[in-house]
Amino acid sequence: MRRFCVVPLLLVLVEAAQKSDLGGDASAALINHSPMLIQRLQDLFHKGNSTDTILRIRTANSDEVKVIHVHQLLLTLQSDIFDGLLLNQSEVTLQEPAECAALFEKFIRYFYCGEISVNLNQAIPLHRLANKYHMTALQRGVTEYMKTHFSSESAQGHVVSWYHYALRMGDINLQESCLKFLAWNLSTIMSSNEWVTVSDKLMVSLLQRSDLVLQSELELFSAVEEWISKNKPDAPVIEKVLRSIRYPMISPSQLFQIQKESAVLASYHNSVQDLMFQAFQFHSASPLHFAKYFDVNCSMFVPRNYLSPSWGSQWIINNPARDDRSLTFQTQLGPSNHDTSKKMTWNALFSPRWLPVSLRPVYSESIPSSSQSNRLEEGKPRLVVTSAMSGMDFAGVTFQKTLLVGVKRQQSKVFVKHVYNVHQSTDEVFDFLLQADLQKRTSEYLIDNSLHLHIIIKPIYHSLIKAK
């Protein structure tokens, strides 16, 4: 549970006036009894002394009416909506959904003390109330709470419902934050109760993305098939969803298997027949030869972020602030059946405090050692991934390195917080582990004092001169 503490407008004005009174007098002092005033305001609300307005809260399809006695000044000072509603009125009736009505007294208490507690189930109704009554600071506070609690445990899950709510409210920022979390933790979402609550629109949006983090494209197909079976969307939606699966990223043997065993694919075979045929063609030739005849500059041939060992390696770095670390691992050359047996070797180097050569200290007896040490402490985390197979040239393909940073293990799960795409080094992005503070054992980026990374190598194909 999180509490938001916002000083009411009245106290802000009082504090500003007090500071102005001090002027430049060095002997002046500020006596601050704001907490006592807040406590008295809370007591005023709880005891109902000297109230001048009555709020009646009704809920649709219910005869129950909640009555709250309030002080009009405190509401109208902070909400222009209440200012309009209570103009020349001492009693108003408000219609609220049941979940909002249940929290309305708590919401009104916020006007008196500037503080409110919130949990996962209360986030949407509180955000809705803050939005309706133009309580901007509270709305921002609840939004930030939601963004920092995507990975919190809940029985039914909550990020999908938060996305759908943000979509209805037109909150683009919250929508994007929810989408990003869902995309980067899709394997976890697909195995949770949330998966069947995904709407048609959200499913289509997710499947368009190349940054989905999951074990394999086959895992995605199986989860999508389950979603179709349980939700039974309209035929056009099913066709669009099935055509968003990247079949070339599935091996030929697995393609044969789903063709034979998938009931959904059997029903909609004609809708994806061309894509399946193209996938088999992709696997039957080298990517270089395939690119001469087909356009590979489309999403169908762009790998997503697959966690299986053939695509990269997990890297758990214990005590990452200590010193440089290195890792050597192998991946397949590419997803084509022509390349899966060919291996690429990669070297990764992690530096917790890296400085460009131009900024590195010059060690000299004339320069205090403390200054040299301070300069080193100014370095930032850096990760470089290079091929160990120097001199090899691959026409028509470049290798993108995708770096996943995991945080907040819950029930043995590691959630992805950041995804970085680089050609070789994190120097190419400005914010790699910028807020991590790896020297603090309490850093949210450290799980049992270890930094959890996953390196994925993604071959990106490019069209060549087409054969005539």
Curated annotation (Swiss-Prot):
Residues spanning the signal sequence:
1-16
Gene3D superfamilies, per this entry? 1.25.40.420, Potassium Channel Kv1.1, Chain A
Query: Ranges for the BACK domain?
Result: 159-259
Q: Where is the BTB domain?
A: 51-120
**Alphabetical list of InterPro entries matching this protein:** BACK (IPR011705), BTB-POZ/Galectin-3-binding (IPR051481), BTB/POZ_dom (IPR000210), SKP1/BTB/POZ_sf (IPR011333), TRAF_BTBD17 (IPR056184)
| Gene Ontology cellular component list | extracellular region
Disulfide bond annotation, renumbered to this chain: none
SMART domains in the record: BACK, BTB
Name of the protein in its database record? BTB/POZ domain-containing protein 17
Gene name of the record: btbd17
